[in-house]
Curated annotation (Swiss-Prot):
Keyword Transferase carried by entry: yes
Catalysed reactions, as listed in the record: (2S)-2-hydroxy-3-oxobutyl phosphate + 5-amino-6-(D-ribitylamino)uracil = 6,7-dimethyl-8-(1-D-ribityl)lumazine + phosphate + 2 H2O + H(+)
GO terms of molecular function: 6,7-dimethyl-8-ribityllumazine synthase activity
Task of the protein: Catalyzes the formation of 6,7-dimethyl-8-ribityllumazine by condensation of 5-amino-6-(D-ribitylamino)uracil with 3,4-dihydroxy-2-butanone 4-phosphate. This is the penultimate step in the biosynthesis of riboflavin.
UniProt entry keywords in alphabetical sequence: Riboflavin biosynthesis, Transferase
Natural source organism: Synechococcus sp. (strain WH7803)
Protein family according to the UniProt entry: Belongs to the DMRL synthase family.
The protein's annotated pathway: Cofactor biosynthesis; riboflavin biosynthesis; riboflavin from 2-hydroxy-3-oxobutyl phosphate and 5-amino-6-(D-ribitylamino)uracil: step 1/2
GO cellular component, one term: cytosol
Positions of (2S)-2-hydroxy-3-oxobutyl phosphate binding: D90, T91, R132
Uppermost EC category: transferase
Protein name: 6,7-dimethyl-8-ribityllumazine synthase
Amino acid sequence: MATFEGRFTDAQGLRIAVVVARFNDLVTGKLLSGCLDCLHRHGVDVTPESSQLDVAWVPGSFELPVAAQNLARSGRYQVLITLGAVIRGDTPHFDVVVAEASKGIAAVARDTGVPVIFGVLTTDTMQQALERAGIKSNLGWSYGLQALEMGSLMHALESEA
């Protein structure tokens, strides 16, 4: 029986794209900072001159899937991370955006075979979003770690095939 696991120490040669929603950038900017900190601490070059990492900004979480799809289809990246924050309001807009963003991001991963980390916060209040982006913890760090694990796992699976 073979057992496959991703490792967090296998960042060399890994190309990562991060797609960030600009809407609620008070939150998404903090998620990005946490994500980049994690990647840097695990050996990914996150400098502006990096050939390992690219960051793409989109208007909002609804637009995350189309940008992620374009990047995944380019063949340049082994893993993508999507970062967004959708905060419930008084209208059904929240439900539409969350549903389409999550379905779209999942479809990109399925259709391209490139892992896409779902880093979209869905909260009832801005306070809850800020707590998840740095006040209590920064989920951006977790999303970076998930990307490293999935990139490493995919490499292990491809090597075995």
